[in-house]
Design a protein with these regions (language model features):
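Acidic, amphipathic alpha-helical patches
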Residues: 22-23, 78, 107, 146
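Conserved beta-alpha-beta core of the PfkB/ribokinase-like small-molecule kinase fold
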Residues: 32-106, 125-126
Length: 212
């Protein structure tokens, strides 16, 4: 698809999920809460701040990947929401629209007073991570035989969060995120490369010369 593609999504229950549907007692047994695709979930979108606040009160670390806004309005109360989000995970286009900025530096300057970690995914250009002070650049792992890019951003999130919840340095979290995002593109369907840990490790070593 190069850098542009279209997805068709059947929302199903996403349209109806409400804050009151969430079992916070069950959530309290988790270490981390990740929320994605909020613009496709109208029933809970306006309660995101309450959801993330509750998760933090329960002692969880948190992350948010807004993903694309199909209506392209980009209306989120970031100043209220991001104080409860440990890791903000938009891609480059989403970040610029959400922060109403033309550059990464401009966007970070707008968000830095109330954001924690800002991680910006940028496709074949890799990713950027801001830790509250410095910007760290992570180059992409190049896959010369791309099968499918669907789910690459989600796979980046998973790899990053896996290291983040183990308190590894931001640079290592970014590296693992970039690797799992690239591994995703070697199989079709968004999850094909992650059938089991052994398969994922084999792909990492054979395709990217990386021991996972």
């Amino acid at each position: 698809y190069d850098q542009d593609r279209a997805n068709v999504t059947y929302p199903g229950a996403m349209n109806d999920l409400r804050l009151e549907d969430i079992d916070f007692e069950f959530l309290s047994s988790a270490r981390h809460m990740h929320f994605a695709n909020c613009f496709m979930q109208p029933g809970i979108r306006n309660d995101l701040t309450a959801l993330f606040r509750q998760a933090k009160e329960l002692g969880l670390t948190t992350s948010l990947d807004t993903q694309w806004d199909p209506e392209e309005k980009w209306e989120l109360p970031l100043e209220e929401l991001l104080p409860y989000v440990d890791v903000f995970l938009p891609n480059m286009q989403e970040f610029k629209f959400l922060s109403e900025s033309n550059t990464v530096e401009e966007g970070i300057n707008k968000l830095k007073s109330f954001a924690h970690y800002i991680i910006i995914k940028n496709g074949s250009e890799g990713a950027l991570g801001w830790d509250g002070k410095d910007i760290i650049v992570q180059h992409a792992f190049k896959n010369e035989r791309v099968i499918d890019c669907v789910g690459a951003g989600d796979s980046f999130d998973a790899g990053f969060i896996k290291d983040f919840i183990h308190n590894l340095p931001l640079k290592k979290c970014l590296e693992t995120g970039a690797l799992t995002g690239a591994i995703n593109t070697t199989r079709a369907g968004g999850t094909g490369a992650f059938e089991n840990l052994e398969t994922t490790r084999e792909i990492a070593l054979e395709r990217f010369n990386y021991k996972l």
